[in-house]
Amino acid sequence: MTQWTDVAVLPSWWLCGWVDTDSPGYRTVSIGGTPYTAAAGYHRWPDYIGAIDTAVGAGSWAATVNNRGAVRLSGSSAAVVWTDRAGWLMGMGTDPADSEGSVTSVTSRTPPPGCIPLIGANWVSVDRTAESQITVDRWQRGHGYVWGSAELWRWRLRMVRDAVPSFRSGHLLSGKVTLTSTLPDPSWSDSPWSSSNSSGYLDGYVVGVEGGRWLGPTREVYEVDLLVATAVGS
């Protein structure tokens, strides 16, 4: 089976969540017995990794993102303990209090549930007059009701098999998300999408998920529609 780190085609898009570090949950890692905590804020994914990088930098470690979206923390040999769910969010496959032992680096073992790589993406505006009630997949337990002054979009996303569990794990199925074609590392710099900037990023709030399906008999590529609300004119 093809692994996400071995796919010949590099990601062309990323679906990234936002992370709240005002409260405990996804903000602290212990290195060499010292806890390092990301600065408080509501961070787009690249800024979140940047906040982690700044925090662990006090211990002479660094947080980076490779060209497939995997997060890597590295530095001098030290015991690494994930004191909260930051490790899980970054794809380390860990639970709170899990230890990596004494290491010089740790790298995402799965596509990070906080920001998954995509091998394709496109979007269309949803006609709210024709689609005032939208049925979503069963893991969302119900329907999305569309109302107010927001615009609704259907983002069609394609991902490799290994990214599907990370997508379904929940962080990207609610709250604010960003769709970007620029590598979401701490140096991320992009401009919003517009008619004159077709490669720009899109921000929105998840309303629901429609119709996941495998493309082809090998079940290596998965396609799903994400319903996203944006401010009028975004």
Regions found by a protein language model. Give the residues of each.
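Short amphipathic beta-strand/extended segments with alternating polar/hydrophobic composition
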Residues: 35-40, 79-86, 107-108, 120, ...
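Short, exposed beta-strand/loop patches in secreted or surface proteins that constitute
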Residues: 28-30, 61-65, 80-81, 95, ...
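Short glycine-rich, low-complexity/disordered patches
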Residues: 58-70, 96-104, 108-109, 178-190
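Short beta-strand-centered interaction patches in the first periplasmic/extracellular domains
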Residues: 52, 56-88
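Secondary-structure transition/turn motif
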Residues: 32-34, 40, 72-79, 158-161, ...
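Extracellular/virion structural assembly segments
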Residues: 1-13, 115-234
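Threonine/glycine-rich low-complexity segments that form extended coil/beta-edge repetitive scaffolds
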Residues: 1-54, 82-115
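Short polybasic amphipathic segments
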Residues: 24-31, 71-73, 177-182
